[in-house]
Each structure stands twice: as structure tokens, then as C-alpha cells.
Amino acid sequence: MSRVTLSRYLIEQTRSNNTPADLRFLIEVVARACKEISHHVSKGALGGVLGSMGTENVQGEVQKKLDVISNDILLEANEWGGHLAGMASEEMDNAYQIPGRYPKGAYLLVFDPLDGSSNIDVNVSVGTIFSVLRCPNEYLSQNETLNENAFLQPGTEQVAAGYAIYGPQTMLILTLGNGVKGFTLDRELGSFVLTHENIQVPATTAEFAINMSNQRHWEAPVQRYVGELLAGETGPLKKNYNMRWIASMVADVHRILTRGGLFMYPRDAREPSKPGKLRLMYEANPMSFIIEQAGGASTNGYERILDIKPESLHQRVSVILGSKEEVERVTAYHKE
């Protein structure tokens, strides 16, 4: 039986699920960009791409060379095809305008070009996270200047989301709103090939991912929940748990997606005015969409991530996602 490439899968989705041709083309272009990013990541020190740029992004985070390279690759790959009305990125203060010499399309692309890039110099898995939204009608005019308001849609409005993980293998995880598929890059073939047909997050788990060094700063519900996990079989949950923390959201969530668990990056007391560390639009929303489509759940502790109405492009949020039963337990603790 012949292998199913990403292109073939998307064509079949167009035939069977009425996936628009423009959306199919957009996903293929993003996938090609991810292949190019994977190539740069894999060269490491040999390609002169490691280290810092000496600049900061809008979040005040030091930009790695590969942050900027990956951002440029995604912009250049997607700006000319006529399928996008605009783009937004972790690495840019404002929305990216499609150059006037190119036609505009019906979609918006939001992305973190290289999640986990602080780990790139130590050869830890990193990745690209992306989200696709429909552009509101009032911004579809060729001459209309796009501003961030076009992007401020709740995660329930996403039409597609995915991430590429650059590890021992390069994989693309994708949802079009009808389940989650996994594609592995066949470097000899030069294509992403369907290798994981119907990814499901196990409902229960014995693993969790959180940065324990921040424990003293967490809110009481998170303190309580993690304390119960650490108590193991002698505690109220009557089960031993293992902790895993890679400090790369793509890597941590990918592990949870494939074998179950709970990923937590809660708000803490050091910056009370900030509701969390991770960005809603291009980290929490796409990952939450994927996790929910795989049978898991995602919350900020008080409400479903996908129901949050964004107020700004780079809005931060507390994130707790993964196996459904555990997410529901943490949510219940927050509501007591």
C-alpha cells in the first residue's frame, strides 16, 4: 500500500470534508516552510545559526539567530500565495501586512516560529506552532490596512492548527477540526508522510510536566494539586506520578499528546498583573485546539482556553492541558 503524503491527505480532505482549496494550499506552504526551518535547525553550529542576535522581541525576550531565521522563512513562504490577509508572530510587535504587489486571501496565520529556542544551543527539541483563522470580512479589501483587531478571535474560531517538532525525527502534527494526524518527514522522499492516523490523549495519566522551581510562587489550587501528585500512592490520589520537564512547550506537549499526561504553566505571584507566561494567540490556542481534538482538555484554571476572547495580540495566559480527567481535577480545585 502506498504511503499517504501530507499533500495527498489534504487533497482527500478537500474531496471528503470540503476543506477549502486555499486552506489546503496554506497548510502545504506552512509545511514546506517547516521543512526549511528543520534543515537550518539540524545544521546547528555547522550552519552558523546558533547563539543570540543581541536583540529582544516584543516580549522582552532575547532573540536567537534561529528565531529570526525561522520568522523570516515563514513570512517569505506565505506572503505571496494569495491565501492570506495577514500574519502575526511572536517575533513581531504588530501584524504583518501582505505586500501590495501580492493578492490577499481569506485567512490569517499566527505563529511562534521557533518555540523553545532558548534550548537550541543545547540541542533540545524545538518546534514551530501555528494557528489559522478566517479574516473578518471588513479586512478583506485589497487596500484595507490590517490591524491586530482582525486577529483577536477566540480559539473556537480556529479553522486549523498544528506544530512541527524538530527532534530525532521532524514531525508535523495537524488538526483541521476533525481529529489529529501526525506526519513524519521522510527526508529521502522530501515529503511529510502520514504515520499517526488518529492521535488520542489517554484520559488518565501518571505523568505531569511543570517547572518545579517556581513552586513557591504558584496559587493555592496548583500547590494543592501538585502536592497530591508528589504524595503518590500514600496521598489522596493513591497513585505514583512521574514528573517530566523539558522547558520546550512543543516537546512537552508532544510527549503528552502521544502518551498522556498533564502540562502546566500556571500564573504565579512574581508578576501578579500577568495572567501567565505563555501567549494565548500562537501558543495556548493552537495547542489547546490540538489537545481537545485528540480527546484531551485545556484550561487556564477557571475557563476553557478556547473560550477566552483575546484583548491583545501578545496576550499571556495560564495554561493547564492534557489528559481530560486531570484537567478537570485541577479546574475543580480552582473553583472551590
Swiss-Prot record:
Binds 2 magnesium ions per subunit. It comes from the Bacteria. It catalyses: beta-D-fructose 1,6-bisphosphate + H2O = beta-D-fructose 6-phosphate + phosphate. InterPro entries: FBPase_C_dom, FBPase_class-1, FBPase_N, FBPtase. Mg(2+) 1 binds at residues 90, 112, 114. One of its GO terms (molecular function) is fructose 1,6-bisphosphate 1-phosphatase activity. It is found in: Cytoplasm. One of its GO terms (cellular component) is cytosol. It comes from Pseudomonas putida (strain W619). Its EC number is 3.1.3.11. Its cofactor is Mg(2+). The keyword Glycosyltransferase does not apply. GO terms for biological process: fructose 1,6-bisphosphate metabolic process; fructose 6-phosphate metabolic process; fructose metabolic process; gluconeogenesis; sucrose biosynthetic process. This is Fructose-1,6-bisphosphatase class 1. Substrate binds at residues 115-118, 211, 277. Homotetramer. Mg(2+) 2 binds at residues 112, 115, 283. Belongs to the FBPase class 1 family. The lineage of its organism: Bacteria, Pseudomonadati, Pseudomonadota, Gammaproteobacteria, Pseudomonadales. Keywords: Carbohydrate metabolism, Cytoplasm, Hydrolase, Magnesium, Metal-binding.
